[in-house]
């Protein structure tokens, strides 16, 4: 329910605790907060949808003090934030319930935004970044591949597929230009990252074909 804690790893003693809903106006999603915290230098990043701004909140690892906020969405999603080093420089990728954002680390205005309103706000899996491409995939509205350019503000939809590639909770896996994704209708699927071309599907040989199939791909 929006409580952030830090504990001593040797003794289990509580070092600090923050109520992010009460103190930072974080927005509780339908199924509660589940985005994993992301460590960054001396800070830890939380995707908690603070209002009116602060999709991502940075706290001091040492004492829990708020260091900065960045990003604007109407609530919090479930996807952990992703730190990347793009051609234009470092940026923070946040997939919220209504948009995908490239954000400045340390606060400020978004470098870029791509609208993507997700049914029930279920932006769940952490985006992946390879070959200058950000990839996200949702259950109802499919997959988006966003190509980043030479400058921090350069971002455009490279391709999208709302019918054939629809993931949910299973993290996509990338290897040598190919992505592997657990699709809701056809099971484990392999496709080209740059084009979205489907190479093969296993038709649920590894997972149940009923609603919400799930598996961890490694």
Model-predicted segments: where are they?
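Noncatalytic, solvent-exposed loop/strand surfaces
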Residues: 1-218
């Amino acid at each position: 329910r929006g409580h952030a804690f830090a504990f001593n790893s040797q003794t289990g003693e509580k070092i600090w605790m923050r109520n992010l809903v009460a103190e930072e106006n974080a927005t509780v999603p339908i199924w509660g907060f589940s985005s994993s915290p992301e460590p960054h230098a001396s800070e830890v990043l939380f995707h908690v949808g603070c209002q009116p701004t602060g999709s991502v909140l940075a706290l001091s690892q040492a004492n829990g003090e708020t260091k900065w906020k960045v990003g604007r969405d109407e609530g919090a999603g479930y996807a952990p934030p992703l730190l990347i080093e793009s051609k234009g420089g470092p940026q923070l990728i946040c997939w919220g319930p209504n948009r995908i954002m490239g954000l400045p680390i340390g606060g400020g205005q978004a470098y870029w935004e791509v609208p993507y309103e997700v049914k029930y706000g279920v932006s769940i899996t952490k985006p992946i970044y390879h070959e200058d491409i950000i990839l996200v995939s949702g259950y109802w509205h499919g997959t988006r591949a966003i190509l980043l350019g030479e400058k921090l503000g350069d971002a455009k939809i490279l391709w999208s597929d709302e019918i054939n590639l629809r993931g949910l909770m299973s993290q996509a896996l990338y290897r040598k230009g190919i992505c592997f994704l657990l699709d809701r209708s056809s099971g484990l699927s392999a496709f080209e990252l740059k084009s979205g071309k489907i190479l093969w599907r296993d038709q649920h040989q590894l997972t149940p074909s009923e609603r919400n199939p799930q598996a961890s791909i490694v």
